[in-house]
Amino acid sequence: MRNQVTANKDTWNTDSDGNIRLSTTKNFKEMGIQQADTFAAMEIDVAALDSVDVDIGANSDVSKKIMNLSSQIKTPLLVSGVQKNTYGRQNQAILFDPQIKQIYTKRYLTPFGEYIPLRSIAEKVSKYTSQVNDISAGEVNTIFKIQDAKFQSLICYELIDDRLIRQVESDFLVIQTNNATFGDTPQLDQQLNIARVRAAEISRYLPYVSTTGVTSFIGPQGEIISQVQKFEPATLFGEVAKATGVTYAQKYGRYLEFIAIFGSIGLLLMRRKGRR
């Protein structure tokens, strides 16, 4: 069986009072209503990282609007944003169907971007450090369930963490990211290419969804199946096939690193010994 996924590049920009701006929301909702039959055939609609730029838990109006949209298009919605709870501020991927069904909390945090390493020392170096609130990391490897398929989501730079990649055993992997901070720089293509390598490494389809970067459907050999251009709001429809098990790269890849390191050391020692 094949599963259909929608990668949505629009973001849910909101005012400070939690209301979604009509210009963006109106377009997004009209797109959903006008293509209701197409969305109904989808098994999930995925929005980019920070697609909701307010705390969903603290803004019930925003949460209700997302639930209403999911109900209107008859499709689960995977959105993301920062929420505050008993653990502090957390970066999360949230599945609506149409109510909140499952939540994944980002486990690998980006140094200086999401927390300040060695904070006590950093605060002595820069007075602005104290104004930065650390984000709290999650601990659970959430496996989302939609109809007869399962998938995992990694957020932004989590895709560079080998430990998290080794844990991917679901049918496909979703990457939600926000490249807006980097503007039109090589970083946009760099992160996409890392995702392509990861898709080949785990031999799975990988919907890659970015706010401003190159939103793409990536095949299990790292090939680009379809994509939309940078900075262009768009909805990308595609199909992904389910995969099972783990690859040799996931299972034994870590050992190759040690073999390469100690092998190189051994060759250097042998070379030095041969010169004597």
Model-derived segments and spans:
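Enzyme catalytic cores with a strong preference for nitrogen-chemistry domains
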Residues: 1-276
